[in-house]
């Protein structure tokens, strides 16, 4: 085992050694020795040495306040560096085959050959390939932009050091650079001092595009093209756009009062400015490259007859267009009222002249030049357009109903919110069909209502290409969808936007089918949507509401019934997945998660949210992003060309039982245990999390309520901090054991072998169990929970132990994650640093809760532990 990851371990050692030097220089020998003692005790405790575990606890209990911050920061940085080394390892030349999946696409092709899938079908599936990743801000992306840029540079150094023919002079220079970067990170703020604004979040998203995706997209398409050529004999069409991006940053106003219509307008301007800026870099590079003099007639005509270097002449025209666009957008961003529009409005303004150059170079025998940087730029133009990313708008359904309520009361026709669903639909369809405006000129709406209407006006003023979808959270009825169409129409929106209901609680998921059926029965609505409907499936709220097993089945069921409705109605359906990084929020390794969906659910392509810290792990470096695109592409092609089996009726029946039993078990604790909420508040840093300057949105929808008013993210985040990770497993193992006791062992084993949906669920549970740590959870209880609440923690841990046995028994496995040695190793590697952070966090919570006003020192150290554990647990919220 040890030899297996030798290259990775030697990088971890080297980075750790350099960090040690930095700590010694910054804080002296005493702190360095303290950190080393704790690290060694932790390593020995991990190996099962109980005496050293006790010593570790004592060591941390006796740390003076002023040493807590540097010690905590040391372990936080160790973890960040371990994560970098691990992320780098997956793309390094020393990477073991079973980790890198060197080639998801090629292994898919050999599967297709084995299953006699025709090349014609494959070519069609490739043409239909549509992956839309929706970048969302995330309070758990604790890593600041400054740090992320340093991480990218550290990666570059690791890559250099791997070259075997590096001279000793170059090696020294690179090692010195690494040491500087690690020192820079150490002396920067790990944690933001202020909450980020929605604009900061949007800029963070643009930085991901600039640092990674801008390179990754053409690289991915180039690789894909070569593979298709060798397998199918034809490559990707030049205008193919299998991967593109949308964003919620600056558009998601659900529960976030800071995202206003003016913020949305500014983000749209910034997004276009950034796109123009990135294209300008490309064009400048092409100007230096394309100095050729021979061209076809079309290029000569575009360049003007007397041009000696026609390609450069065309590119210089584009450069002027982009510079002018940037200047005008810049002035608008800085508040100048300009009547002129930025000249770059449509993708064709870039595509047509560049494509003309491309064709001319090919015609004149210079194809090898055309297929270089010019082709990359053309591919970017298709993927990123003039807006860089399309913006989604998200708002809660009740906010739209409030607008209509206030309006109908003003018009004297009653109170919209009190009407029956039938009356609402009649009113909305009537108004949608009507030519006269509905909003009276002299009406002065209240502030919240005006804000919703102003947002609709911003949408109406922008081109269709600027937006992805209008997502309605907590959508429950057909009128919720029609209401948004009406408000957009009233704002003068000249096109029909994709209005996408988000079904997120257990009941809403179960009703999704009937809502969409009802919409499809309205002729007017059918006319609007031009045979295309998008529906979003919420993962986090359903899991918080009913537990993971029950939520997982409800999501599967909802997808399956929506696919059927769409087929019956002859409508194209796009399912939009609101997954998070954690299992409690639907996270699973991408490839497995997609293959475990119902048959035909990926026909309309994939649209999925990528969140905060997962953006960094999956898309943060160009090579890593290319790997992620390959995994997504191969999974979608496989799901569409080799669909998973339809579940047998007896599997479904048993899933119904599992779902019911697990939901009861979960709610029995979360809602039924009178001590549960006080225990949760004492055993986790939930209350302290609210103070963290993490995301731009508040942690609670309603500041006074219990668990149900907590947002899904802090709910899950808090439990992953104390290592009980309760929401990701509670109820599931009990339901499995219940079914075994009822004599269904053989059927469960069959489901495990033959049904990807079920085996993925169990695989996700195994990963969660591996990340749970009962001893640490018990230590939090001893240090933080009052004695009369401690028995509840003991009961939960006993349940967890029983659940692990039940799941391993059904899978016929001896140990957790035995089929995923790399996953195991990766968790083990980080645990050495996570455990001390957990101990430190429990100590810090204990100390801050002892005083009315905790010192800034302790608060900062506490925030660093929260950030560090989040980095160590990888999928936090």
UniProtKB/Swiss-Prot annotation:
It is an enzyme of class 4 (lyase). GO terms for biological process: carbon fixation; oxaloacetate metabolic process; tricarboxylic acid cycle. It catalyses: oxaloacetate + phosphate = phosphoenolpyruvate + hydrogencarbonate. Pfam families: PEPcase. Its EC number is 4.1.1.31. Its cofactor is Mg(2+). The keyword Magnesium applies. The active site is at residues 138, 544. GO terms for molecular function: magnesium ion binding; phosphoenolpyruvate carboxylase activity. It comes from the Bacteria. The keyword Transferase does not apply. One of its GO terms (cellular component) is cytosol. Keywords: Carbon dioxide fixation, Lyase, Magnesium. Forms oxaloacetate, a four-carbon dicarboxylic acid source for the tricarboxylic acid cycle. Belongs to the PEPCase type 1 family. This is Phosphoenolpyruvate carboxylase. It comes from Vibrio parahaemolyticus serotype O3:K6 (strain RIMD 2210633).
């Amino acid at each position: 085992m040890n030899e297996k990851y030798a290259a990775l371990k030697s990088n971890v050692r080297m980075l750790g050694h350099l960090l040690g030097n930095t700590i010694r220089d910054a804080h002296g020998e005493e702190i360095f020795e303290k950190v080393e003692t704790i690290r060694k005790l932790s390593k020995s405790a991990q190996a099962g040495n109980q005496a050293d575990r006790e010593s570790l606890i004592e060591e941390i209990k006796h740390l003076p306040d002023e040493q807590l911050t540097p010690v905590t920061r040391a372990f936080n940085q160790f973890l960040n560096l371990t994560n970098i080394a691990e992320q780098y390892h997956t793309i390094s030349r020393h990477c073991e085959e079973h980790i890198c999946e060197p080639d998801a696409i090629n292994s898919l092709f050999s599967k297709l050959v084995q299953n006699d899938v025709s090349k014609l079908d494959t070519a069609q599936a490739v043409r239909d390939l549509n992956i839309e990743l929706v970048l969302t801000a995330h309070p758990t992306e604790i890593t600041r932009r400054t740090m992320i840029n340093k991480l990218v540079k550290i990666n570059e150094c690791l890559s250099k050091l791997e070259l075997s023919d590096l001279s000793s002079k170059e090696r020294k220079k690179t090692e010195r650079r690494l040491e500087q970067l690690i020192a820079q990170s150490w002396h920067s703020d790990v944690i933001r001092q202020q909450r980020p604004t929605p604009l900061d979040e949007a800029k963070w998203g643009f930085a991901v595009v600039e640092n990674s995706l801008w390179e990754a997209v053409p690289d991915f398409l180039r690789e894909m093209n070569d593979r298709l050529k060798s397998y199918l004999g034809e490559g990707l069409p030049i205008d193919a756009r299998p991967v593109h991006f949308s964003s919620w940053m600056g558009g998601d106003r659900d529960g976030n009062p800071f995202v206003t219509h003016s913020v949305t307008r500014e983000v749209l301007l910034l997004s276009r400015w950034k796109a123009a800026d990135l294209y300008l870099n490309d064009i400048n590079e092409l100007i230096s490259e394309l100095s050729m003099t021979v061209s076809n007639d079309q290029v000569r005509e575009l360049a003007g007859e007397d041009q000696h270097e026609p390609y450069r002449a065309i590119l210089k025209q584009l450069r002027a267009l982009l510079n002018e666009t940037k200047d005008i957008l810049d002035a608008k961003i800085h508040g100048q009222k300009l009547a002129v529009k930025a000249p770059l409005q449509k993708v064709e303004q870039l595509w047509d002249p560049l494509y003309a150059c491309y064709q001319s170079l090919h015609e004149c025998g210079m194809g090898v030049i055309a297929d270089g940087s010019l082709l990359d730029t053309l591919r970017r133009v298709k993927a990123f357009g003039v807006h860089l990313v399309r913006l989604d708008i998200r708002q809660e359904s009740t906010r739209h109903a409030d607008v209509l309520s206030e309006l109908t009361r003003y018009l004297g026709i009653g109170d919209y919110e009190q009407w029956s669903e039938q009356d609402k639909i009649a009113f909305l369809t009537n108004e949608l069909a009507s030519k006269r405006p509905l909003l009276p000129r002299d009406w002065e709406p209240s502030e919240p209502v005006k804000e919703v209407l102003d947002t609709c006006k911003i949408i109406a003023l922008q081109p269709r290409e600027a937006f992805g979808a209008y997502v309605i959270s907590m959508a429950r009825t057909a009128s919720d969808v029609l209401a948004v169409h009406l408000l957009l129409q009233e704002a003068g929106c000249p096109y029909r936007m994709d209005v996408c209901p988000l079904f997120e609680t257990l009941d809403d998921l179960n009703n999704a089918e009937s809502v969409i059926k009802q919409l499809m029965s309205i002729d007017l609505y059918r006319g609007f949507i031009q045979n295309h409907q998008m529906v979003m499936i919420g993962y986090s709220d359903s899991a918080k509401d009913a537990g993971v097993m029950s939520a997982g089945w409800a999501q599967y069921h909802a997808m399956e019934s929506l696919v059927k409705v769409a087929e019956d109605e002859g409508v194209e359906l796009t399912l939009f997945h609101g997954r998070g990084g954690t299992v409690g929020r639907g996270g699973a390794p991408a490839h497995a998660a997609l293959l475990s969906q119902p048959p035909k659910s990926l026909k309309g392509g994939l649209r999925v949210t990528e969140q905060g810290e997962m953006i960094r792990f999956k898309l943060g470096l160009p090579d890593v992003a290319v790997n992620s695109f390959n995994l997504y592409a191969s999974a979608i092609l496989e799901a569409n060309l080799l669909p998973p089996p339809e579940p047998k009726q007896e599997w479904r029946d048993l899933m119904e039982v599992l779902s019911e039993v697990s939901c009861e078990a979960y709610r029995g604790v979360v809602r039924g245990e009178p001590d549960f909420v006080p225990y949760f508040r004492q055993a986790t840093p939930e209350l302290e999390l609210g103070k963290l300057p993490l995301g731009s949105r508040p942690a609670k929808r309603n500041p006074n309520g219990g668990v149900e008013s907590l947002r899904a993210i802090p709910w899950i985040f808090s439990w992953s901090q104390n290592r009980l990770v309760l929401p990701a497993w509670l109820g599931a193992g009990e339901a499995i054991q219940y079914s075994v006791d009822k004599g269904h062992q053989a059927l469960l084993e069959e489901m495990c072998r033959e049904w990807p949906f079920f085996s993925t669920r169990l695989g996700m549970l195994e990963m969660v169990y591996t990340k749970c740590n009962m001893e640490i959870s018990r230590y939090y209880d001893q240090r933080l929970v009052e004695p009369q609440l401690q028995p509840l923690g003991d009961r939960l841990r006993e349940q967890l132990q029983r659940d692990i046995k039940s799941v391993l028994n059904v899978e016929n496995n001896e140990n957790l994650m035995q089929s995923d040695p790399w996953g195991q190793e990766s968790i083990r590697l980080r645990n050495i640093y996570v455990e001390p952070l957990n101990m430190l966090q429990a100590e810090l919570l204990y100390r801050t809760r002892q005083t009315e006003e905790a010192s800034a020192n302790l608060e900062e150290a506490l925030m660093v532990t929260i950030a560090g554990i989040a980095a160590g647990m990888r999928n936090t919220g």
